C-alpha cells in the first residue's frame, strides 16, 4: 500500500477526487452540518488542514483530513474526517506514517471526534475514550 499526503496544489488536484469519494458519504452523515467535503478541500488548499490517502493496487482504500490543534501544554493532530475500505489493513501501513508525521510537527497525541463505529475501529488502534463532546446550539433569539 502507498501513503500519499496532498502537500502541493498539484497533489491536491490529482488526488482530491479519490479523497472525496471515500470521505463524502461519511462526512455527509456525521459532520452534522459543521462542514462538508468542499469545506475540507478549501481548508486543505489554504493549508489550514492536511489530507492523506492510502492506495492499494486496486485503488484508494483510506482517506483522512486532519489539522493541528495547539493547546497550552501540548500539540495534537486532530482528525477531522477519516473513512475508507479495508481500514484495518490500510491502517497497518498508514498508522506508523501518521504517527511520524505528527511527531515531526511537534504533536504529542492524535485525537478524533468519531461516531460509534469509527470509535470502535480507533479503539483497536490504541485510542482511548477521553471525554464526551457536548454541543449547545445558540439560537438567534436571546
Model-derived segments and spans:
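Conserved donor-binding loop and adjoining core beta-sheet/short helix segment
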Residues: 45-88
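Active-site/acyl-donor-binding loops of N-acyltransferases
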Residues: 112-116, 120-142
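Acyl-donor binding region in acyl/amide transferases
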Residues: 74-124
Amino acid at each position: 500500500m502507498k501513503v500519499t499526503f496532498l502537500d502541493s496544489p498539484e497533489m491536491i488536484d490529482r488526488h482530491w477526487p479519490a479523497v472525496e469519494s471515500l470521505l463524502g458519504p461519511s462526512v455527509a452523515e456525521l459532520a452534522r452540518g459543521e462542514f462538508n467535503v468542499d469545506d475540507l478541500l478549501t481548508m486543505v488548499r489554504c493549508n489550514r488542514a492536511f489530507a492523506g490517502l492510502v492506495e492499494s493496487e486496486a485503488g484508494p482504500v483510506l482517506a483522512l483530513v486532519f489539522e493541528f490543534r495547539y493547546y497550552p501544554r501540548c500539540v495534537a493532530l486532530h482528525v477531522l474526517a477519516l473513512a475508507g475500505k479495508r481500514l484495518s489493513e490500510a491502517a497497518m501501513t498508514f498508522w506508523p506514517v501518521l504517527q511520524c508525521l505528527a511527531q515531526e510537527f511537534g504533536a504529542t497525541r492524535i485525537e478524533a471526534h468519531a461516531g460509534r463505529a469509527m470509535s470502535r475501529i480507533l479503539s483497536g488502534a490504541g485510542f482511548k475514550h477521553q471525554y464526551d463532546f457536548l454541543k449547545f446550539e445558540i439560537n438567534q433569539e436571546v
